[in-house]
């Protein structure tokens, strides 16, 4: 949302070295690197068909089981051998554009059980001292959109971003120390929980008024 965008991208391109809004005690510049320094492509496939938990990457709901999204299983075990296996805290990029995700959603897989995703998706996994909660918020912001806009080729299909894997992992990113990453992610998550709770109160009040 807007809060994440303001917290994670204080400049026009989202790559401010020293964000204007900081927690007390943190004043060192953010690290500057490529996505490949923090993440590696995940290419493990479901060759033996062992995993049947097909996961969809929805712009609104994130990574959820296909059976929950469509109310039934669409893919069958005969055609999932080419699907990628994802595990807890892996990230998945769905290049399909939508009004909610103009450059396609990048979502973190929060479920504990392994799942499989379409080979049309790009899967990647954190390496080293990376806080996946922070980067979940990072990818929910628009900090990376300009790079995809400048680098990707949407000419082939207007509804889908076309970007080479090497170009995707060359994406420039800026991020703070792991301690500050955790603090930022915790802060944004707390705000989101507060907003959700307030929305629940509003919804319940509306239901009450309709019933009176």
Predicted region positions:
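Non-catalytic DNA-recognition/assembly elements of restriction-modification systems
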Residues: 18-46
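Short coil/turn segments at secondary-structure boundaries
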Residues: 48-56, 150-152
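A short beta-sheet element
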Residues: 81-144, 154-157
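Extended intrinsically disordered, low-complexity coil regions enriched in Ser, Thr, Gly, Ala
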Residues: 13-16, 183, 195-210
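A short glycine-rich beta-alpha junction/loop motif
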Residues: 114-120, 153-179
């Amino acid at each position: 949302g807007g809060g994440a965008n303001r917290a994670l991208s204080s400049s026009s391109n989202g790559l401010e070295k020293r964000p204007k809004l900081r927690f007390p005690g943190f004043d060192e510049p953010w690290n500057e690197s490529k996505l490949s320094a923090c993440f590696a492509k995940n290419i493990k496939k479901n060759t033996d068909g062992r995993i049947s938990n097909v996961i969809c990457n929805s712009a609104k709901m994130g990574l959820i089981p296909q059976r929950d999204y469509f109310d039934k299983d669409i893919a069958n075990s005969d055609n999932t051998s080419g699907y990628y296996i994802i595990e807890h805290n892996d990230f998945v990029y769905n290049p399909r554009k939508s009004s909610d995700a103009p450059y396609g959603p990048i979502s973190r897989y929060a479920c504990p059980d392994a799942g499989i995703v379409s080979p049309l998706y790009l899967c990647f996994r954190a390496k080293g001292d990376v806080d996946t909660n922070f980067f979940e918020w990072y990818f929910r912001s628009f900090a990376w959109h300009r790079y995809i806009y400048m680098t990707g080729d949407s000419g082939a299909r207007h509804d889908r971003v076309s970007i080479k894997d090497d170009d995707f992992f060359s994406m420039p990113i800026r991020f703070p120390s792991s301690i500050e990453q955790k603090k930022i992610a915790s802060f944004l998550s707390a705000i989101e929980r507060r907003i959700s709770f307030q929305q629940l109160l509003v919804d319940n009040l509306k239901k009450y008024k309709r019933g009176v």
